[in-house]
UniProtKB/Swiss-Prot annotation:
Keywords from the UniProt entry: Aminoacyl-tRNA synthetase, ATP-binding, Cytoplasm, Ligase, Nucleotide-binding, Protein biosynthesis
InterPro entries with a match to the protein in the record: Aa-tRNA-synt_II (IPR004364), aa-tRNA-synth_II (IPR006195), aa-tRNA-synth_II/BPL/LPL (IPR045864), Asp-tRNA-ligase_1 (IPR004524), Asp-tRNA-ligase_1_N (IPR047089), Asp/Asn-tRNA-synth_IIb (IPR002312), AspRS_core (IPR047090), GAD-like_sf (IPR004115)
Natural source organism: Cupriavidus necator (strain ATCC 17699 / DSM 428 / KCTC 22496 / NCIMB 10442 / H16 / Stanier 337)
Name of the protein described by the UniProt record: Aspartate--tRNA(Asp/Asn) ligase
Family: Belongs to the class-II aminoacyl-tRNA synthetase family. Type 1 subfamily.
Any Pfam family matching the protein: tRNA_anti-codon
Length: 602
């Protein structure tokens, strides 16, 4: 391999018995057993046991002085381990290396934690990320990330896609998430924006005739962070010309099947099911439903319109209200304490409470039910609830009644919490498998109550369905988009759309978004001009590489599959970024910081 080593530690097996090897790596552990020193030597491929006998005094003295995380080089002979001392958990578990020479390449100060400690706080791990990355799980995660990226590149290359870089310094467009801004020194008072997506550039590459484009690139969004968000994230960005929506979906569905098979030996469905956005929201309260959970909403809005119980009747009679039931088979066994905990849980999502009915005996109707709300419901409503939910003896029905968004968010989250719980898994409410699907036919627009205007649900370059073009000017709320999301186990793996390729339609969409012609020209004139030069029909997708690898690795957070991530406060604990900068740098950028107003003293 090199003059310093002949093999990786973790790849030395019994086939090399009797051979001389040179190994380099880090000391995982050093043990002194009756005058013989054992060293677990680690590199990126795993561990090997090194045995140091005292019959080589110089080597043995060096072995006595080494400690955990010393970087060392050893030479020695591979031999079988004594019978009964084999380690089946290691690739090298049947052999050991009898050390002839040991060189300390670089000692280590005492590490702040043991690398095999699985109970470290994330703050500790991110502060000492260099050491954290030495741990086998992190090594696995980042190598898996590399493998996924390589499989993507191989697939797209075979399909005729060209890897083209697009600018990192671009124009700020205040639509959507907040931009990261970069001041221009040579253009005082002007700013670049780091890209939230290469969206417009990749469309212009289609206008330029490149036909099939991709890149694996960094994108940036200055937004509040969650477990699956980072201020900078990696996108597998793809665009193609002259394909229909169905052909685009088929192509990238095949890509994901190939990547999952080659990266982690998982066979995804031969054909991903397709679900309309409207159906996903009706059944699951989410546009990225986790189909592993065998629970669904039952629509009860009409049933509750005439009940003498305002908790249900008020939202049922409201234009933006909704009432649903969530039947949990066998849920009658859920304790009152657990119900109280669920009530607190849905409150996180804005729910004011959590009504419930335990079904003891369906045949007895009202008398077979247990709940404080039964007295507020008339017999016809009770009968309809039991009928529509398909309730059986021993079930529980939870209810959501509020604005549709609150109901969807809160009961949707409750559905997942129950499904993923020990109770859900023990009662067949969760299937531990891979459940991909396409969600299609998204609304083109959603109404922003605060700004009193329509906003793009995806982005303003998504094409409306051909039969809905007339709604752009008459009723934007009716307009459906040629948009599609690939969902897997409740995560959006990627999303895309067929794009607008005619300048006149793009202008109509801008107007529907309350962007007048002058504003559109100022912000997107270069795109409108490009579309006039015979732009081809085109569309594409963007996949979140971080999310894909997180799912494959079974990690708790995307921070576990990124080498140097930011915290939920958008900070890098390793380098202490962001940080203050020198006054001279600010002057060169023509920037002056406004001092924080001091608080008045009492």
């Amino acid at each position: 391999m090199s003059s310093m080593r002949t093999h990786y530690c973790g790849l030395v097996t019994e086939q090399f018995s009797g051979q001389e090897v040179a190994l380099t790596g880090w000391v995982q552990r050093r043990r002194d057993h009756g005058g013989v020193i054992f060293i677990d030597l680690r590199d990126r491929e795993g561990l090997v046991q090194v045995v140091c006998d005292p019959d080589r005094p110089e080597m043995f003295k060096a072995a006595e002085e080494i400690r955990n995380e010393f970087c060392i080089r050893v030479t020695g002979k591979v031999r079988p381990r004594p019978a009964g001392t084999e380690n089946a958990n290691l690739t090298s578990g049947k052999i050991e290396v009898l050390c002839h020479e040991l060189t300390v390449l670089n000692p280590s100060v005492t590490p702040p934690f043991q690398l095999d400690d699985d109970n470290l706080s994330e703050t500790t791990r991110l502060t000492h990320r260099v050491l954290d990355l030495r741990r086998p799980q992190m090594q696995y995660n980042l190598r898996l990330r590399y493998k996924v990226a390589m499989e993507v590149r191989k697939f797209l290359d075979a399909q005729g896609f060209i890897d083209i870089e697009t600018p990192m310094l671009g124009k700020s467009t205040p639509e959507g998430a907040r931009d990261y801004l970069v001041p221009s020194r040579v253009n005082p008072g002007h700013f670049f924006a780091l890209p939230q997506s290469p969206q417009i550039f990749k469309q212009m590459l289609m206008v330029s005739g490149f036909d099939r484009y991709y890149q694996i690139t960094k994108c940036f969004r200055d937004e509040d962070l969650r477990a699956d968000r980072q201020p900078e994230f990696t996108q597998i960005d793809c665009e193609t010309s002259f394909l229909t929506e169905q052909e685009i979906r088929d192509l990238f569905e095949d890509m994901m099947r190939t990547v999952f098979k080659n990266a982690i030996d998982v066979d995804l469905d031969a054909r991903f099911p397709v679900m309309e956005f409207r159906e996903a929201m009706a059944r699951f309260g989410s546009d990225k439903p986790d189909l592993r959970v065998k629970l669904e909403f039952t629509e009860l809005t009409e049933v509750m319109k005439d009940v003498d119980f305002k908790v249900f009747s008020s939202p049922a009679n409201s234009d933006n209200g909704r009432v649903v039931g969530l039947r949990v088979p066998g849920g009658g066994a859920i304790s009152r304490g657990e119900i109280d905990a669920y009530t607190q849980f849905v409150g996180i999502y804005g729910a004011k409470g959590l009504a419930w009915i335990k079904v003891n005996e369906v045949a007895k109707g009202r008398d077979g039910l247990q709940s404080p709300i039964v007295k507020n419901l008339h017999d016809a409503a009770i009968a309809e609830i039991l009928k529509r939910t398909g309730a059986q003896d021993g079930d529980i029905i939870f209810f959501g009644a509020d604005k549709a968004k609150v109901v969807n968010d809160s009961i949707g989250a409750l559905r997942l919490k129950i499904g993923h719980s020990d109770f859900g898994k023990a009662n067949g409410l969760f299937e531990d498998t891979w459940k991909p699907l396409w969600v299609v036919d998204f609304p083109m627009f959603e109404y922003d109550e605060e700004d009193a205007r329509w906003v793009a649900m995806h982005h303003p370059f998504t094409s409306p369905k051909d039969e809905h073009l007339e709604y752009l000017e008459t009723d934007p709320g009716k307009c459906l988009a040629k948009a599609y999301d690939m969902v897997l186990n409740g995560w959006e793996m990627g999303g895309g759309s067929v794009r607008i390729f005619r300048s006149d339609i793009q202008s109509k969409v801008f107007r529907a978004l309350n962007i007048n012609d002058d504003e559109a020209r100022a912000k997107f004139g270069y795109l409108l001009d490009a579309l006039q030069y015979g732009a081809p029909p085109h569309g594409g997708l963007a996949f979140g590489l971080d999310r894909i690898v997180t799912m494959m690795a079974g990690a708790d957070s995307i921070r576990d599959v990124i080498a140097f991530p930011k915290t939920q406060r958008a900070q890098d604990l390793l380098t202490q970024a962001p940080s203050s900068v020198d006054e001279k740098q600010l002057r060169e950028l023509h920037i002056r910081l406004r001092a924080t107003e001091p608080k008045p003293t009492a």
